[in-house]
A protein has these predicted regions:
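Non-catalytic, usually N-terminal nucleic-acid engagement modules in DNA/RNA processing proteins
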Residues: 3-186
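Short gly/pro-enriched beta-turn/loop segments at secondary-structure junctions
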Residues: 188-190
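Glycine-rich phosphate/ribose-binding loops and adjacent secondary-structure elements
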Residues: 179, 183, 192-233
Length: 233
């Protein structure tokens, strides 16, 4: 119990950089590369839970902090004993930090050093996300892998803004880590915090961000700001 995430490469292709691997966490193993069904509000749409387990054989699914926070709300998930019990899925779950949804779905968002204020796309109520309360929310949701709160710049976006945004993401990461390190998991299994590399489509910024994030020495790192409208090349 409570072991840290471990990643091992299980096979490599001599003619390319393709490889397969295995991620081991408290709740089991995830063989990579993996298709991770999206269960935004906890459940994967159009699929019964038994199909998810028996037919699709999903080793991990994704939930979304922004959506779960707004509906059904963290209190309900917490009372149910965490997201796994709430949706009756005993394999690994990853939650993203809600950063992207704040920028793409909500209106009147205001980004400051402290965090982001935004209006719910459901009923227009105003909320405030900070690196600290996003970690708290994800602790209470109880996913196995939780993402750091970042700013996802839009595409296209000028160099100056992307650089400023990337630096903010790095400062927020420091705060995420400090909150994560000073809080405990609530449901008796280890959670892994994963930071996100930003930098838009600018190669030098991507490199700076990757180098900065590697310094934190997390068990895994994510690549953010992809599939936000940029061309495939």
């Amino acid at each position: 119990k409570n072991k840290l995430m471990i990643f091992e490469i299980t096979s490599e292709d001599s003619k390319s950089k393709a490889r397969t691997g295995k991620i081991t966490i408290d709740r089991g193993e995830i063989n990579t590369p993996i298709f991770m069904p999206v269960g935004t509000l906890g459940s994967v749409r159009g699929v019964h839970q038994h199909e998810l387990t028996d037919d699709i054989k999903s080793e991990i699914i994704l939930g979304n902090t922004y959506h779960l926070f707004l509906r059904p709300g963290v209190e309900i998930i917490n009372k149910a004993g965490g997201i796994h019990k709430f949706i009756n899925f005993d394999k690994p779950i990853l939650t993203d930090s809600g950063g992207y949804q704040v920028y793409s779905l909500s209106e009147n968002r205001k980004i400051s050093e402290e965090g982001v204020s935004f209006q719910s796309h459901i009923d227009g109520t105003t909320h405030f996300f900070t690196p600290e309360n996003v970690i708290d929310i994800q602790r209470r949701i109880g996913a196995d892998i939780i993402m750091a709160f970042d700013e996802c710049p839009p595409y296209p976006c000028d160099y100056k803004y992307v650089k400023k945004s990337m630096n903010l993401t790095h400062r927020w990461l420091k705060r995420c880590k400090s909150k994560f390190d000073s809080t405990a998991n609530l449901y008796g299994f280890n959670q892994t915090l994963v930071p996100i590399v930003q930098g838009g489509t600018y190669k030098d910024l991507r490199k700076i961000s990757a180098q900065k994030i590697v310094e934190f020495n997390f068990p895994a790192n994510a690549i953010g700001g992809l599939s936000v409208g940029e061309p495939h090349d």
